[in-house]
Amino acid sequence: MHDGFEMVARIPYPVTAPKFYTIASEVATMRFLRSSGLPVPEVYDYSPSSDNAAKTEYILMEFIRGTDLSDVWMELEEPDIVSVLRQLSQLESRLMSIPFPAGGSLYYTNDLEKVAGTTGIPLNDDRFCVGPDARVCMWYGRRSQLNVHRGPCTPLSDFPFVEPS
């Protein structure tokens, strides 16, 4: 672009399954983390459905120029390594402090409702919810054809227990 603006257009591999859940969850996760103050690229637009002019699912997101840590790690001096590790541990601490009500993948509530007919388990910010697990291991190959529960899964402590008599 003429003004230096750059963005990334991402489309899923043909074997990505299920595309809707994968794209919808990735976008919701990125936007949720960004709204929580974590340094995540901005998502400009997305479609978890192929029902659009491009005829494919997509994510249009901010391009961030930088250097891969793995490219410079071996040349870093000890103070730089300590600084990097401190920054990473601070980010991880912030990430792990975000409460989630259930196991599964993160979605925009309205996206999940469109495809699953359910709103999932809401977060404090009700734009977001926890829904089916979108990890590839849950859907790979013929697993995508199985009619099984993929989440959300509430913690065991939330299940009612009947005391033995």
Predicted regions and their residues:
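ATP-binding pocket architecture of kinase catalytic cores
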Residues: M1-S165
